[in-house]
Amino acid sequence: MSKKPVLLCIMDGFGKNPDTYGNAIAAAKKPNLDRIFAENPMTYIGASGLDVGLPDGQMGNSEVGHTNIGAGRVVYQELVRITKAIEDGSFFKNPALVDAMENCKKNNSALHLAGLLSNGGVHSHNTHLYALLKMAKDFGIEKVFVHCLMDGRDVSTTSGKGFIEELEQKMKEIGVGKIATVEGRYYAMDRERKFDRVEKTYRAMTSLDAPKFDDAAAMMEKSYADGVTDEFIVPCVSKDAEPVKDGDSIVFFNFRPDRAREITRAFVDPDFDGFKREKEPKVFYICMTQYEAEMPNVEVAFKPERIDMPLGEVFSKAGLRQLRIAEFTKYAHVTFFFNGGEETVYEGEDRILIDSPDVATYDLKPEMSAYEVTDTLVNKINEDIYDAIILNFANCDMVGHTGVFDAAVKAVEAVDACVGRLVDLVASKGGVTLITADHGNADRMIGDDGKPFTPHTTNPVPFVVVGYPCKLREGGKLGDIAPTMLEIMHLPQPEQMTGKSLIVK
């Protein structure tokens, strides 16, 4: 007998933008989604700012989006937690951060502050770095080196020079700190096991084995003139730098885990085999948040706050079979983040990881692995064993981040083809498909200045129900999706899940 599965399809980076200028979603030929949107109950829901536990006006992101969707409630994010701790002063008494400072005092060693130098608020925030500099000054630490990971994805592609200049001014005001290395996030924040990139950052930090610069801002200016934007700055070293040495402290101030794991493991994991480490300094390493539950030899400054009864746990306790499926670049989002930031695999939960294509940037293959994901999922649906399926298509986000408009259009069209196949298959089984997104991106590819626009947008995202006649309310948010799914599946909503179903009674 055929199962009647409920499929939650998350089209990463698919926002609603009424302005068609620079809008790859509006420009794409998407007959399936156009038909689905026209013929089925639909609403638009909040995926940014206060709706997802971020500061008002702050763009959402994939980690935040999937956490809120899986939790079925507004989850207050690490950006807010850390910023509040700075404001109330508790940041400066944080035990892990104090330990890092005390280690430097005890060993007369250097403090290295490493992270994404940006106000994007997706992986880090530069105000958190400034607070660490102030703390170092208060502790009387003299040797403080900043390793500047440049953004160009969550903010403008050439905003990095301004962030460097602001940092230099802050260090002058506070009275401590020198820029040691500068590197694009393409190298330092890989999450796809492309360790040749990470190695360049590691060698720059530990051996100063990289091109040298006298003035960071001037180096950035030259990079722009050479056509190299922030994200792709090849790791380089200041004339004032000292390498990371035995006894030094490192505080990695990114609060989002996924792109901080590889470089952290290179420093702390004795079994790390991503590349041969010429030097392995024994350091006192602080992660701003928990990057991995089993990360060895680190302290965590802001430990995770547990999310009780996320959607996956509800399914498991109801005795249902569930499947999580995505390509590699979004696999953590439908598993770790969807499960409330925990590595737990629930009873009855299966996971399928499809490799992402091995290309330098995803505009070179805008379909990514969407067709492989879809082919695999079609076969799994036809096995008739799953009650609930959580799926992510990465294309609109990952290709959107490249800033290449024509490629983003192709990405949308690939997702359209795949969603059309899956909706028809689920319908043939008598099942229900819910279509949504975690945040916007491909809905704005060109900025007001006419240059490529690579960050996420703050636009609302679609929520569509196919195969379950109903009326949907307005004013919802991502945290309302799980309660809606539970209502459709006739499952009780746990009291911990404070979101409200989008279905009008």
Spans of features found by a protein language model:
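Feature captures the catalytic ectodomains and active-site-proximal regions of enzymes
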Residues: 1-505
